[in-house]
């Protein structure tokens, strides 16, 4: 392979939504229609699904590689699949919908360029998904927090509305979802709403005869409007993300594997910079350094990996147990990542039943890391719209408040200023099985021995 990036732009799409909204089935059908599956493999899966009485999960089953997942009927970890459209090479991240698996869902979102929110139009199912405890709301909020600017809404299970393929029901679902997405911060005019049936395949790759009333989706872009009919047309109309290849390397690890005959293979998505075989890289917060022997993406060797690539790479002389999910890899010779002893952030409290005081210690989800951090100091309460200071050293914070706070990680943690490396500088704070706050990192105090770098960033306006 040459040192040039492949001609088709890479896009990472995370599939989000409430459990049983039909995410895996819709995704599986989409990949199937785009030729991403071997027909013979599909026949085997169909036979196995029929044997277990799960024929209705056929396309979802294609995505459920793990045996444990098949038996439990829930997508647990994040599955990665690849297919081609006319314009893009798309990697699908199929994220779990069960509340218990929200941590995996956050990890998937942090890797994505685009979120495809699947909502069920089936009677009762939509209402459950958007209820206060449903995941539709939380997933959409997390996607926005993690910086996923492009969102597609797939109104699924149109074959199960009353009557089937109901125009009225589609409009009702769209109206409800639009209100919530606007509250989060998305502009509904930029979001395509597409009616589909993941099970029958209606309107996935070509316009549906059963939904003649659907005149197509239309979205606003900087250069005018874009429109189309099917879900596949939406994917081809996406705006390619700007990839910061000229910044130093930052690669948060998603997992680390030991592969027989090869050795230690960390995997993850390059957020910034470029990775090449022969490069010496450092991992933070673990502190280890190693040489990159080889790089692979979708089982193909690469001589250069660019931002947005989901890759696996082999490193020399480093044990699997020395690295783990949440470590960040960087070029040892160019602004390598380091462990944070504390960091200052601008946060918005979204959902806490009481008051938050100094000492509060939620789990912070940032890039692929999940680390408990203490709200060590509440520095100032600010106006969430203007960023102006309202109060110094507030005694407590409640839902709706915005503040500048200092956080101290309980375990080793690598974060960056949002200004320098956005994907490593935005986070969600979780407690009580829900997202209690979201924030952006303004400055980082690096652990003794790490180079003291960078000045404090100006307040970031969070809408």
Swiss-Prot record:
Single GO MF annotation: translation elongation factor activity
Stretch forming the signal peptide: none
Listed SUPFAM superfamilies: EF-Tu/eEF-1alpha/eIF2-gamma C-terminal domain, P-loop containing nucleoside triphosphate hydrolases, Translation proteins
Transmembrane parts of this sequence: none
Region (G2): 73-77
GO CC aspect terms: cytosol
Region (G4): 156-159
Listed InterPro entries: EFTu-like_2, G_TR_CS, GTP-eEF1A_C, P-loop_NTPase, T_Tr_GTP-bd_dom, TRAFAC_GTPase_members, Transl_B-barrel_sf, Transl_elong_EF1A/Init_IF2_C
Region span, G5: 197-199
Superkingdom of the organism of origin: Eukaryota
Binding sites annotated in the UniProt record for GTP: 17-24, 94-98, 156-159
Keywords per UniProt: Cytoplasm, Elongation factor, GTP-binding, Nucleotide-binding, Protein biosynthesis
Region (G1): 17-24
Main location: cytoplasm
Protein's cellular compartments: Cytoplasm
Known partners and oligomeric status: The 42S RNP particle comprises four subunits each of which contains one molecule of 5S RNA, three molecules of tRNA, two molecules of EF1-alpha and one molecule of the 5S RNA binding protein 43.
Protein family: Belongs to the TRAFAC class translation factor GTPase superfamily. Classic translation factor GTPase family. EF-Tu/EF-1A subfamily.
PANTHER family: TRANSLATION FACTOR (PTHR23115)
Protein name, entry field: Elongation factor 1-alpha
Organism encoding this protein: Xenopus laevis (African clawed frog)
Taxon lineage: Eukaryota, Metazoa, Chordata, Craniata, Vertebrata
């Amino acid at each position: 392979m040459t040192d040039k990036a492949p001609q088709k732009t890479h896009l990472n799409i995370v599939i989000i939504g409430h459990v049983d909204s039909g995410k895996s089935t819709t995704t599986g059908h989409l990949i199937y229609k785009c030729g991403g599956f071997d027909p013979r493999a599909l026949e085997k899966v169909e036979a196995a699904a029929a044997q277990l009485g799960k024929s209705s999960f056929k396309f979802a089953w294609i995505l459920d590689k793990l045996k444990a997942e098949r038996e439990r009927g829930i997508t647990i970890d994040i599955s990665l699949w690849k297919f081609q459209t006319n314009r893009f090479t798309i990697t699908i991240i199929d994220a779990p919908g069960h509340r218990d698996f929200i941590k995996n869902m956050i990890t998937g979102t942090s890797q994505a360029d685009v979120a495809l929110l699947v909502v069920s139009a089936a009677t009762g199912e939509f209402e459950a998904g958007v209820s206060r405890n449903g995941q539709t709301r939380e997933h959409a909020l997390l996607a926005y927090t993690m910086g996923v600017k492009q969102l597609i809404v797939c109104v699924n299970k149109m074959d199960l509305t009353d009557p089937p393929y109901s125009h009225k029901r589609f409009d009702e679902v769209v109206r409800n979802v639009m209100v919530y997405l606007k509250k989060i911060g998305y502009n509904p005019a930029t979001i395509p709403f597409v009616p589909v049936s993941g099970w029958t395949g209606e309107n996935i790759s070509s316009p549906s005869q059963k939904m003649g009333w659907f005149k197509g989706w239309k979205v606003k872009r900087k250069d005018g409007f874009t429109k189309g009919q099917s879900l596949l047309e939406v994917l081809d109309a996406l705006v390619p993300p700007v990839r910061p290849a000229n910044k130093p390397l930052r690669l948060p690890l998603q997992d680390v594997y030991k592969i027989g005959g090869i050795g230690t293979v960390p995997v993850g998505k390059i957020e910034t910079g470029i990775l090449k075989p022969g490069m010496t890289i450092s991992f933070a917060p673990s502190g280890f350094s190693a040489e990159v022997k080889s790089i692979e993406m979708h089982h193909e060797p690469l001589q250069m990996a660019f931002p947005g690539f989901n890759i696996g790479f082999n490193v020399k002389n480093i044990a699997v147990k020395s690295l783990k999910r949440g470590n960040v890899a960087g070029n040892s010779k160019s602004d390598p990542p380091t462990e944070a002893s504390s960091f200052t952030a601008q946060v918005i409290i979204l959902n806490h039943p009481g008051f938050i005081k100094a000492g509060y210690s939620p789990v912070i989800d940032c890039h692929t890391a999940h680390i408990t951090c203490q709200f060590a100091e509440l520095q100032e309460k600010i106006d969430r719209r203007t960023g102006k200071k309202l109060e110094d050293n507030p005694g407590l914070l409640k839902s709706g408040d915005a503040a500048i706070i200092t956080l101290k990680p309980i375990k080793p943690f690598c974060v960056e200023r949002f200004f320098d490396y956005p994907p490593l500088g935005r986070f969600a704070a979780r407690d009580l099985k829900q997202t209690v706050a979201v924030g952006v990192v303004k400055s980082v105090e690096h652990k003794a021995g790490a180079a003291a770098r960078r000045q404090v960033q100006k307040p970031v306006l969070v809408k």
